[in-house]
Amino acid sequence: MNYHRVYIPNSFVHIIIASYERKHIFIDNIEILRTAFKNTMQNYKFEIVAICVLPDHIHLILNPENIKEYSKIISSVKHSFSHDVGQVCPTYFCSQDDLKIGYKNKREKGLFQRRFYEHTIVNQEELNNHINYIHYNPVKHGYVKCVKDWKYSSFHKFVEDKFYDKNWGNPNDIENIKNLDFE
């Protein structure tokens, strides 16, 4: 079955990239991931509005200059990260048998799930809800008790910019995102 992505000009896109078999690879290789994004920014024009890196998946909101390029942006990040992690630590790659089975059954291989989730954001309220969801994600998954304690997200930049109070994330703050579940 072919998958067709929707491209709405001048929009933001919430993207979730997951590792193959949800292996914990991103935090251990955070500098390689940062480099992958920097390398991709040399070839494509986009802004990362919000991001949260978890051990097995990444949430980000992109604002690409050309909305039709967000798939290429993600492909470039995945390629750069896979290449560099493979150079540093090839044991992150699956065995050849796992690759054959994964590719045959789900057309997946390497470090990432083949597809990524994407949702086009159409208004400011929705953008704010998605930003909140992304920043609350480490608490949702039980990695920390307070949003401010997770250092692998853009939350701290949002605090600096006065979007959030540094103690944001209590039950009243997250009321609007309770029904959002993108995973």
Task: Give names to the regions the model predicted.
Residues M1-E183:
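Short catalytic/metal-binding and nucleic-acid-binding patches
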